[in-house]
Design a protein with these regions (language model features):
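Alpha-helical packing segments of well-folded alpha/beta enzyme cores
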Residues: 76, 83-84, 102-105, 109, ...
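Active-site cleft segment of glycoside hydrolase catalytic domains centered on the general acid/base Glu
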Residues: 126-156, 160-189
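Acidic/aromatic-lined carbohydrate-recognition and catalytic surfaces
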Residues: 14-19, 95-99, 103, 158
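Low-complexity, Ser/Thr/Pro/Gly-enriched N-terminal "stalk/linker" regions
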Residues: 2-79, 108-147
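Structural helix-adjacent loops and short alpha-helical linkers that scaffold large soluble proteins
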Residues: 6, 88-107, 121-122, 148-151, ...
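Well-ordered alpha-helical scaffold segments within catalytic/enzyme domains
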Residues: 3, 81-97, 111-115, 157-174, ...
Length: 189
């Protein structure tokens, strides 16, 4: 490539050009996992971070931390999960090892999306966070102020993510059926 007077060294454009980048991004995403031990990075975290709605509580650990801090957004988890599922579908017949890791990470995201549904249109949606917690309930660092919202457009997006996951994660008929059911419910909200 030549830009002005600058010239890059010669490089080859090859088949499967993006696989190295996909592995690196996938490993970074794994390191951002919340509620899961990441060897050499952190132990299980934020189990005692909770949302509350209608007399019920849900632990908000799961999904992935934001890259800049420890915050969480369920809708962003949906966006990342959808991208991982799309990449999985493209790689499943080309690079089975990469596809398996993409699928595993997408399943982690699906679990977080599903566990934060209250089933009445409301969902734990987000929390800005800058601290590590001890993971023990009823101690000084417990946080129960995770935002809970019922947003029609967000529910529409979740329905799409859940439906796509239902079509993609085809090795677990019970999960497929559940994803399809909640997609229909979320679409109606």
């Amino acid at each position: 490539l030549k830009v002005g007077t600058s010239l890059t060294p010669t490089f080859r454009i090859r088949e499967r050009l993006w696989e190295d980048s996909q592995w690196k991004v996938l490993n970074f995403i794994f390191c951002q996992r919340c509620g899961h031990p990441v060897p050499g990075k952190h132990s299980t975290c934020h189990v005692d971070l909770m949302s509350r709605h209608d007399g019920r509580s849900i632990s908000y650990s799961g999904g992935w931390h934001d890259a800049g801090d420890l915050s969480q957004q369920t809708l962003q988890t949906g966006d990342v999960t959808f991208a991982l599922l799309e990449a999985y579908n493209k790689q499943r017949n080309i690079n089975p090892a990469l596809a398996a890791r993409l699928r595993e990470e997408a399943e982690w995201g699906v679990e977080f999306i599903l566990k934060n549904r209250y089933g009445d249109g409301y969902r734990a949606s987000s929390m800005g966070l800058l601290i590590w917690q001890d993971g023990v309930f009823n101690t000084l660092d417990d946080i129960s102020s995770v935002r809970v919202q019922n947003m029609a457009f967000d529910n529409f997006l979740y329905a799409g993510y859940e439906a796509y996951a239902s079509m993609t994660l085809d090795n677990d008929p019970m999960l497929q059926e559940y994803l399809l059911r909640v997609a229909e419910e979320d679409f109606a909200f």
